[in-house]
Amino acid sequence: MLKVAIVGASGYTGIELLRLLHGHPEVSVTCVTSEQSAGKNVAEIFPTLRSRYNLVLENLEPVRIAERADFIFTALPHKAAMEVVPTFLKLGKRVVDLSADYRLHDAREYAAWYEPHMNPELLKEAIYGLPELRREKIAEADLVANPGCYPTSIILGLAPLLKKKLVNPATIIADAKSGVSGAGRSAKVDNLYCEVNDGFKAYGVGGVHRHIPEIEQELSLLAGKQLTITFTPHLVPMDRGILSTIYAEPAGEVSLAGLVELYRDFYHGEAFVRVLPENNFPSTAFVRGSNFCDIGLTVDKRTGRIVIVSAIDNLIKGASGQAIQNMNIMNGFPENLGLESLGLFP
């Protein structure tokens, strides 16, 4: 039985890790931390866990945690993770980090979008944890950087086209919409019910959203050359889910039937990517509560552009579910352990 610690367990990604790991036959959660809620039982913070967990939230003390856990999930805010991850690694623990602290390979790029990195040497060692593209490297990694939610939906949506060089990378536009849980659990005026309900707004407009360098880094690796995309995120008044609509001009003549076949071949055997039939498109309603990424696509007959639509649950395939998928790979477990739940409906 793998003993697991969740560092930063009182946020939305923390509760999702606890919920999903409860059904994992090879895992026992032995330690949970929260600086703000230390001393409280997790069921006080998340009543949904009543009678299923009897864990008390602790202060973050890496040495004590490492004594009781074999594997660490860090679900901390950006910057906070880099303060503790090196210690866990030195103590011989393997880590999946759910923050953005280790997703970028270039320390200068990280500093430009966030702030100077405290341990830039680890940026080269961390493996970007998108299992469908990095499975072999994830299996050998000590530190996996769990991808962001928007990047997951966009990279999976574009990977087959870029790998086969079927689109002009300079024409890529990604228009994505997210539920409010993507902003985290801390109290913010912009996320209050009266501020969000009955509204739909763009934010991070004009190439300033922090997920951009992560998206461009991974798409550039797929394309084999540096690329720049246009990305605009939107906030939708729903709890969870991301729907990304992606546009790109083909590099040559394409057919819809050929594109669907390409995607099915590319994702053949993948447990959590579902390619829909021609002219069928995903909905966040059908992936809610699951680790699936649903992808549909078409060719706009008027403009010739390829249109890809992808849907994920931002808290699961976009965060905690993907983190568990990475943990499974790192420990030689079947990849789908603990992640077989179908989406909630309605």
Swiss-Prot record:
PANTHER family: N-ACETYL-GAMMA-GLUTAMYL-PHOSPHATE REDUCTASE, CHLOROPLASTIC-RELATED (PTHR32338:SF10), N-ACETYL-GAMMA-GLUTAMYL-PHOSPHATE REDUCTASE, CHLOROPLASTIC-RELATED-RELATED (PTHR32338)
Keywords on record: Amino-acid biosynthesis, Arginine biosynthesis, Cytoplasm, NADP, Oxidoreductase
EC nos: 1.2.1.38
Compartments where located: Cytoplasm
Similarity field: Belongs to the NAGSA dehydrogenase family. Type 1 subfamily.
Matches recorded under SUPFAM superfamilies: Glyceraldehyde-3-phosphate dehydrogenase-like, C-terminal domain (SSF55347), NAD(P)-binding Rossmann-fold domains (SSF51735)
Active-site annotation: C149
Gene3D superfamilies, A to Z: Dihydrodipicolinate Reductase, domain 2, NAD(P)-binding Rossmann-like Domain
Native source species: Geotalea daltonii (strain DSM 22248 / JCM 15807 / FRC-32) (Geobacter daltonii)
Protein name: N-acetyl-gamma-glutamyl-phosphate reductase
A GO CC term assigned to this protein in UniProt: cytoplasm
Pathway: Amino-acid biosynthesis; L-arginine biosynthesis; N(2)-acetyl-L-ornithine from L-glutamate: step 3/4
InterPro entries: AGPR_AS, AGPR_type-1, NAD(P)-bd_dom_sf, NAGSA_dehydrogenase, Semialdehyde_DH_NAD-bd
PROSITE patterns found in the cross-reference section: ARGC (PS01224)
